[in-house]
Amino acid sequence: MAYDSNYTFPDPETSDKQGLLAIGGVLTPKRVLQAYSQGIFPWYEPGNPVLWWSPNPRLILIPNEFKISRSLKKTLKKPFKLTVDTAFQRVISYCATCSDRANKTWITSEMIETYTQLHEMGYAHSFEIWDGSELVGGLYGISLGHAFFGESMFHTITDASKVALHFLCSIMQSWNFDFIDCQLPTLHLMRLGAKIISRKEFLHMLQETLKYPDKKGNWSVN
């Protein structure tokens, strides 16, 4: 993995009660990869310094534990086209427009540039849901070892982001991935099968999954 050897993050256990661990620094692909490998992720508002987080507790989703409601089961029967890594920039741009962490836009232009570079490096991936030729839902995130770190989802029609998450879980399960990091607990994701674990347990799971080689490259699935 391409780490930033010129920067060392503090121990995640030293973060404050909200999970804030460090402030500042330049958002580069190598630094972001190093952060994820230590259970840390960037989250900040436009115009502010980069904030680095390692919350306790943490929310994860085991790929085979995704819960399908009756309404979603009906939606999954619709003739959507499902693709991977065919429209990364469009997905992250939609997510930036629709992002909703405390109803604030947090996907900055700097983040879009950095994660697009990570996509070109083979670490960041997008899952796309199409209704005909229209992109109606999707998500993106980072892959390291046998873990996928979900960043954001969007939908323009009902349940399309859930379809994207179900698609992600199906692919991750077929590749024997261990978990999807959902970062912060939300009722929405918990209803879909995500569960809360301690940061200590998360960091242990992370170190175990990082023993596997990274699945880099374009994941295009038609």
Curated annotation (Swiss-Prot):
GO terms for cellular component: cytoplasm. One of its GO terms (biological process) is protein catabolic process. The keyword Transferase applies. Keywords: Acyltransferase, Cytoplasm, Transferase. Its EC number is 2.3.2.6. One of its GO terms (molecular function) is leucyl-tRNA--protein transferase activity. Pfam families: Leu_Phe_trans. The keyword Lipid metabolism does not apply. It catalyses: N-terminal L-lysyl-[protein] + L-leucyl-tRNA(Leu) = N-terminal L-leucyl-L-lysyl-[protein] + tRNA(Leu) + H(+); N-terminal L-arginyl-[protein] + L-leucyl-tRNA(Leu) = N-terminal L-leucyl-L-arginyl-[protein] + tRNA(Leu) + H(+); L-phenylalanyl-tRNA(Phe) + an N-terminal L-alpha-aminoacyl-[protein] = an N-terminal L-phenylalanyl-L-alpha-aminoacyl-[protein] + tRNA(Phe). Its main location: cytoplasm. Gene3D superfamilies: Leucyl/phenylalanyl-tRNA-protein transferase, C-terminal domain, Leucyl/phenylalanyl-tRNA-protein transferase, N-terminal domain. It is found in: Cytoplasm. Functions in the N-end rule pathway of protein degradation where it conjugates Leu, Phe and, less efficiently, Met from aminoacyl-tRNAs to the N-termini of proteins containing an N-terminal arginine or lysine. Belongs to the L/F-transferase family. This is Leucyl/phenylalanyl-tRNA--protein transferase. It comes from Legionella pneumophila (strain Lens). The lineage of its organism: Bacteria, Pseudomonadati, Pseudomonadota, Gammaproteobacteria, Legionellales.
